[in-house]
């Protein structure tokens, strides 16, 4: 079957307090280049943030409870940006907004060029910004040559 997923169309996050989450996400998503919409769905308020490729939406949770990244479900959400400089700039601007973003750095335990910052939303959902990694570029450029995905770039002799 020749079907290929070309991206993630949308991601919905249930939040415990929609107003509090809007106060957090409005400036964060604006900083990341997203635009806001507020179309309700089935009579319930929803907030949608769009960029060229993806929709990120907030909806009120139906049951109380704190986010637990180690229970079944979403562990964290990572947004990719163009460069380490972009990560540095975004982390600095997030901190200026009052967001507790960790100092960006390399995380070689993930990949040799994994440069990121981390922060959390009001419900404890861990968010991340990572610089475009060489492996992602190589996978995209050499997709047709790659057949194994345990260290695909190394196995194909591209690094």
Language model: regions and residue ranges:
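N-terminal beta-strand motif that seeds the catalytic metal site of vicinal oxygen chelate
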Residues: 1-22, 77, 133-159
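Short beta->alpha transition motifs characteristic of CBS
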Residues: 112, 118, 129-136
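Glycine-rich acetyl-CoA-binding "A-motif" of GNAT/NAT acetyltransferases
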Residues: 126
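Vicinal oxygen chelate
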Residues: 15-20, 78-123
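Residues that flank catalytic or metal-binding motifs in active/ligand-binding sites
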Residues: 7, 45, 52-54, 73-75, ...
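Long, continuous compositionally biased terminal/linker segments
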Residues: 2, 51-82, 88-89
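Core segments of cupin and vicinal oxygen chelate
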Residues: 12-57
């Amino acid at each position: 079957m020749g079907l290929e997923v070309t991206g993630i169309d949308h991601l919905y996050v249930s939040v415990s307090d929609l107003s509090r989450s809007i106060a957090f996400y409005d400036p964060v998503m604006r900083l990341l280049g997203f635009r806001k919409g507020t179309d309700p769905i089935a009579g319930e308020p929803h907030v949608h943030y769009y960029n060229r490729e993806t929709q990120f939406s907030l909806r009120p949770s139906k049951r109380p409870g704190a986010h637990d990244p180690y229970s079944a479900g979403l562990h964290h959400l990572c947004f990719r940006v163009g460069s380490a400089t972009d990560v540095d700039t975004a982390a600095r601007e997030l901190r200026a907004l009052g967001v507790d973003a960790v100092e960006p750095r390399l995380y070689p335990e993930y990949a040799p060029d994994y440069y990121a910052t981390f922060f959390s939303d009001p419900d404890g959902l861990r968010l991340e910004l990572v610089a475009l990694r060489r492996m992602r570029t190589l996978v995209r450029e050499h997709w047709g040559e790659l057949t194994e995905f345990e260290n695909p770039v190394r196995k194909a002799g591209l690094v």
